[in-house]
Swiss-Prot record:
Reaction(s) catalysed by this chain's protein: L-lysyl-[lipoyl-carrier protein] + (R)-lipoate + ATP = N(6)-[(R)-lipoyl]-L-lysyl-[lipoyl-carrier protein] + AMP + diphosphate + H(+)
Keyword tags: ATP-binding, Cytoplasm, Ligase, Nucleotide-binding
Residue numbers binding ATP: R71, G76, A77, V78, F79, K134
Top-rank EC class of the record's enzyme: ligase
Annotated Gene Ontology cellular component terms: cytosol
Other notes: In the transfer reaction, the free carboxyl group of lipoic acid is attached via an amide linkage to the epsilon-amino group of a specific lysine residue of lipoyl domains of lipoate-dependent enzymes.
Molecular function terms from GO: ATP binding; lipoate-protein ligase activity; lipoyltransferase activity
Official protein name in the record: Lipoate-protein ligase A
Gene that encodes it: lplA
Organism annotation: Escherichia coli O8 (strain IAI1)
């Protein structure tokens, strides 16, 4: 029996596609290797720990019938239309390795005639006369026994619409050394005129099969033909809910934000009588777990620099691999509230 599984979605509904992804990830055998290919109609997809009101122009999105979808991985906000091809690779540990899935995508692009390379923490770029241009962005998620890598390839996306719905973080733009979103991305059609979603999916599928030395039949799925996934209706209801995608607007009396080399951080505090009655953390960090834990620790504590710093440093026990990030965060918070 093959250890591979290939699913291709005929749906353009971001909530359906992300719910399928979540279901498969939760329920797949640890020995299985999964490739899921999909695309979304007009959607802003935000990272698990992001604040949609800061990241998106929600008024313009509503006017233009652009959906908001919160994914379960970290990272930043992106705009999807039918000019994007989305891919998700899943595998159990210890086999899960994002460098393998990255190489599969690079091999697929090479087979199509595009020479691309990995750049930074989550991008694929091509070299042009104007410099490196991004053609793909990715995000990742890991649990104790499995992981996934998902991302998008820009085929023929309407790049002019990016600025309509995304509010660029000025500190992020400065940190990346760029002047505009449009200047740093390009479509694959600029390199391969006429390239289609179907051709890209076929190339990725062939590279996936070639890497593992196996082939399987594709499962074509849609809302009318859902895969056999227990609890899919429940997960779809959550994925499409306002509570998941927007949540409650943060009520705060003090806002702190900063951009570090590893991502942006925004802290929202409500403070009453010197105590933090509510703490929220939003971030586009690819590993938001320590920051999510920090929010819980700050709840109910004193709004004092030394106490906040102490709570940051206490997280080093649970997140030793993020020592650099936590120490930078601790120093910044202490200085910001003094």
């Amino acid at each position: 029996m093959s250890t591979l599984r290939l699913l291709i979605s005929d749906s353009y509904d971001p909530w359906f596609n992300l719910a399928v992804e979540e279901c498969i990830f939760r329920q797949m055998p640890a020995t299985q290797r999964v490739l899921f290919l999909w695309r979304n109609a007009d959607t802003v997809v935000i990272g698990r720990a992001q604040n949609p009101w800061k990241e998106c122009n929600t008024r313009r999105m509503e006017e233009d019938n652009v959906r908001l979808a919160r994914r379960s991985s970290g990272g930043g906000a992106v705009f999807h239309d039918l000019g994007n091809t989305c891919f998700t690779f899943m595998a159990g540990k210890p086999e899960y390795d994002k460098t393998i899935s990255t190489s599969i995508v690079l091999n697929a692009l090479n087979a199509l005639g595009v020479s691309a390379e990995a750049s930074g923490r989550n991008d694929l770029v091509v070299k042009t006369a104007e410099g490196d241009r991004k053609v793909s962005g990715s995000a990742y998620r890991e649990t104790k026994d499995r992981g996934f890598h998902h991302g998008t390839l820009l085929l023929n996306a309407d790049l002019s619409r990016l600025a309509n719905y995304l509010n660029p973080d000025k500190k992020k733009l400065a940190a990346k050394g760029i002047t505009s979103v449009r200047s740093r991305v390009t479509n694959l059609t600029e390199l391969l005129p006429g390239i289609t979603h179907e051709q890209v999916c076929e190339a990725i599928t062939k590279a996936f099969f070639a890497h593992y030395g196996e082939r399987v039949e594709a499962e074509i799925i849609s809302p009318d033909k859902t895969p056999d996934l227990p609890n899919f209706a429940e997960i779809f209801a959550r994925q499409s809910s306002w509570e998941w995608n927007f949540g409650q607007a943060p009520a705060f009396s003090h806002l702190l934000d900063e951009r570090f080399s590893w991502g942006g951080v925004e802290l929202h505090f409500d403070v009453e009588k010197g105590h933090i009655t509510r703490a929220q953390v939003f971030t586009d960090s690819l590993n938001p777990a320590p920051l999510e834990a920090l929010a819980g620790r700050l709840q109910g504590g004193l709004y004092r620099a030394d106490m906040l710093q102490q709570e940051c440093e206490a997280l080093l026990v649970d997140f030793p691999d993020q020592e650099k990030e936590l120490r930078e965060l601790s120093t910044w918070i202490a200085g910001a509230v003094r």
